[in-house]
Amino acid sequence: MKFVDEAVIKVQAGDGGNGVVSFWREKFVTNGGPDGGDGGDGGDVYMVADENLNTLIDYRFQRFYEAERGKNGGGGNCTGKSGKDKELRVPVGTRAVDIHTNEIIGEVAEHGKKVMIAKGGWHGLGNARFKSSVNRSPRQKTLGTKGELRDIRLELLLLADVGMLGMPNAGKSTFIRAVSAAKPKVADYPFTTLVPSLGVVSVLPEKSFVVADIPGLIEGAAEGAGLGIRFLKHLERCRVLLHMIDIMPADQSDPAHNALTIIDELEQYSEKLAKKPRWLVFNKVDLMSEEEADEIIQNIIDALAWEGDYFKISAANRQGTKELCMKLAEFMDTLPREAEEKTEAEKVDFTWDYNHKDGLAGREVITEDDDDWDDWDDEEDDGHVIYVRD
């Protein structure tokens, strides 16, 4: 199935049901009081994480999703039925972003998690709500409010422990093939990797971690050049980054300059991402003598002023890959997993109001005329008084 990590949709929460004007009428009761019920609340729209999904491709074909409208109220103080919620099932790791404000509405990072992305409208009030000591037969009601309408961008962020970055043809996909059961495409031309891929690395029966490979970065990626900038977001949840450096590039470019380019593009894209733990991995050491490889590696380290961890491997021959994976597994045990950033509902600016309170404090009140209804207070029929409670 095609990998789709972004989709734009429109969601419409259900409108609230209207209140109703009704009076109690039955045999021997000709002047019963008001018994108009409230409407039902509109349905909400939710995003629900499903571990059985791994792409957002379904949301490329259907772009509009709508929750159910609340039912209108009825006589006999009957409240209308609330509208049915709409649930959008998405892969684990998906977040919803408001297109117009770039506000992160919420994200689902574990199976079954549910986040509201559009709020349904509040119910309208029936005329029974307007009964007072001075207005015994109110003919007023309120309408249900509109459900929230939002344009939303769904973004899928892969959940991985280790993220790989580097220039095209640095050997990232070859490394994943060497250490896991994943089989990404490998070839001797740039941008062989067109979409991110995941591999599970098992170093011991009880120790494993997930590695994410994204398309290679090139100079100017932060301004949109190449493919990698589209997928850098998938590294945001990784706990450590592996910077793969080809010490003998096929295009005869300077490996030190290439390494500096990757670091510069990473810093331009996200300061937070650039501050993540990062290891240098020098690949293709089998293509030259050990002395030549050590000399090139030292030149790169000096150019980067690097003081962190680095490793020498040959992904094609699996030289040094086992030791690197063992070190990564040990590092995972010492590095606590980042706490999930929770988006609290109170901080999300939904556009609904608490209209069940506003109904008596300035919201539009509808007055219905009906000659069949008798007002036993003998009020003049030349107009209606609408009382607003403070």
UniProtKB/Swiss-Prot annotation:
Ligand binding (Mg(2+)): 173, 193
Places the protein is found: Cytoplasm
UniProt-listed CDD domains: Obg
Keyword Repressor annotated: no
Main location as per UniProt: cytoplasm
Pfam family membership, one: MMR_HSR1
Function: Depletion experiments lead to gene down regulation and a dramatic increase in ppGpp levels, like those seen in the stringent response. There is no change in cell morphology in depletion experiments, but cells are very sensitive to the DNA-damaging agent hydroxyurea and are very elongated. Overexpression reduces growth and leads to elongated cells. Overexpression of proteins with C-terminal deletions of 29 or 62 amino acids showed fewer elongated cells. An essential GTPase which binds GTP, GDP and possibly (p)ppGpp with moderate affinity, with high nucleotide exchange rates and a fairly low GTP hydrolysis rate. It may play a role in control of the cell cycle, stress response, ribosome biogenesis and in those bacteria that undergo differentiation, in morphogenesis control. GTPase activity is stimulated by 50S ribosomal subunits.
Name of protein: GTPase Obg/CgtA
Native organism: Vibrio cholerae serotype O1 (strain ATCC 39315 / El Tor Inaba N16961)
The encoding gene: cgtA
